[in-house]
Design a protein with these regions (language model features):
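Beta-strand-loop-alpha-helix segment that lines the small-molecule cofactor/substrate pocket
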Residues: 1-47, 61
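Non-transmembrane alpha-helical segments in soluble domains
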Residues: 3, 29, 55, 116, ...
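Ligand-binding pocket scaffold of soluble enzyme catalytic domains
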Residues: 6-7, 29, 35-36, 70-73, ...
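Predominantly a Rossmann-like dinucleotide-binding segment in NAD(P)-dependent oxidoreductases
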Residues: 38, 45-159, 274
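Short glycine/serine/proline-enriched coil/turn segments at secondary-structure junctions
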Residues: 77-79, 185-188
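A short catalytic or substrate-binding loop motif that flags glycine-/basic-rich loops and adjacent residues
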Residues: 113-114, 158-163, 171-172, 186-187
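C-terminal helical cap and adjacent loop that interface with cofactors, partners, or active-site loops
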Residues: 120, 188-196, 203-206, 213-402
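Active-site beta-strand termini and strand-to-loop segments that position acidic
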Residues: 167-173, 195-197
């Protein structure tokens, strides 16, 4: 779908995991570069409140130099396996549904981006550093094989995905990232999100905590705190002060509107940022190279584990440009540009509503939808003819109101 979009002149935004193997990663990179169109990975966890505040702290030096990070997707899915899509073409004779079938047939971290995306941003991956080496190790499939046996009555001789997979990556600057994947064993939901720095430490699960060295806050924008050391976490008052200071401007702008929507508002913030950057012609928060880097763990991990957990060279998806930009940042328009764009968006929306009413598109759509037999073809053509005039009608209304 993403390839079709770019081949037809449209930017693409893909749900995770956006690419299932290295070939797909390179295909999307090649096409994005060829068409000069964006290919955005819809990684909503990069917009979580704790992750974004920790990113600001890391950028301000609160943790010193971040030298190690951990992320994960630990989410027991036993209640959900049978609700995933089932192939209607009878390619799933054991009724496993796509996700369990994919886990059974593939090794490696198959859902790495929730854990990897936020920590990769904190470690400036592709903005001054990159992954160079990967090693992966997994457990045997115990719970996976048992689920297949229980639900199909058959022994699963070959279940590729281990119940728990651990992937270690070393960067060009000598830092390390650990990513875990476990969708099989019973335990609380956990994305880990841990940052280890030369002056501090952040951890999100099971509770959001920070440990800061006594001199870590000197020279930063953090509020002054007395009697702190890294042997214990900040107390509730200190943590609150730190979190208040590093409220992310993106969340300040969008989070409240989306708080009651998908995943606590992360989806809304992510979609809003995508639209914002496209409207203003700004670099997206995550690009096609990030997408490839984060999605490559599946096949690279499988190669490592199929070769006795050997070290594997990580591809340079940027083709040598990973060190051109120094430090991860979000792009922003000026307040004047934002106001101008908001005014145009409001005017366009009003014009669109007016045009739809003038062309009677909803009435024609309902008529086509409800028509039967020979009348359906005529009703559909009538709707399509009117719909084809929508853009020109909108432009006409906008010109009149200028």
């Amino acid at each position: 779908v993403a390839k079709c979009a770019m081949e037809n002149g449209k930017h693409a935004a893909i749900e995770v995991p956006s690419a299932m193997n290295l070939e797909q990663c390179w295909n999307l990179i090649d096409l994005s570069e060829k068409t000069r169109l964006h290919c955005f990975i819809l990684e909503n966890c990069c917009y979580d409140d704790y992750e974004m505040k920790s990113l600001l702290m890391a950028q301000d030096g609160v943790f010193g130099e971040v030298i190690r990070a951990e992320g994960a997707y630990i989410h027991e899915l036993s209640e959900f396996w049978k609700y995933y899509w089932k192939d209607p073409n009878d390619n799933d004779k054991d009724n496993l549904h796509w996700r369990m079938k994919y886990n059974m047939e593939n090794r490696g971290d198959l859902y790495a981006t929730h854990g990897l995306g936020p920590v990769a941003q904190c470690m400036d991956i592709h903005r001054g550093d990159r992954f160079t080496t990967l090693i992966a190790m997994d457990t045997e499939s115990f719970a996976g094989k048992e689920w297949v046996k229980k639900n199909t009555g058959k022994e699963s001789e070959e279940f590729r995905n281990g119940d728990h997979t651990t992937t270690l990556m070393r960067t060009a600057k000598g830092k390390v990232v650990e990513i875990q994947h476990n969708v099989m064993t019973p335990q609380p939901y956990n994305r880990l999100f841990k940052l280890t720095g030369t002056k501090g430490y952040a951890t999100k699960y099971p509770t959001e905590e920070f440990a800061i060295a006594g001199d870590a806050l000197t020279g930063t924008d953090a509020p002054k705190m007395d009697n702190i050391n890294a042997h214990g976490f900040l107390n509730a008052e200190q943590k609150k002060a730190l979190m208040e200071k590093y409220r992310h401007p993106i969340l300040e702008k969008y989070a409240e509107k989306g708080r009651h929507l998908g995943h606590g508002g992360m989806d809304y913030v992510m979609d809003s940022r995508l639209v914002y950057c496209l409207q203003h012609g700004l670099p997206l928060d995550m690009d096609v190279y990030d997408m490839a880097e984060w999605c490559a763990l599946g096949e690279l991990g499988a190669i490592s584990m199929d070769n006795n957990c050997a070290a594997v060279t990580f591809p340079d998806f940027t083709r040598g440009y990973w060190n051109e930009v120094k430090g991860y940042t979000h792009a922003y328009a000026t307040p004047a540009q934002e106001a101008e764009q908001e005014a145009y968006a409001d005017a366009y929306t009003a014009a669109q509503k007016e045009a739809v009413a003038k062309l009677k598109l909803w009435e024609l759509y309902d008529a086509a939808k409800n028509a039967e037999g020979k009348t359906k073809t005529g009703a559909t053509k009538k709707y399509e003819k009117a719909a084809a005039r929508l853009d020109s009608q909108i432009e006409k209304i906008l010109k009149v109101k200028k």
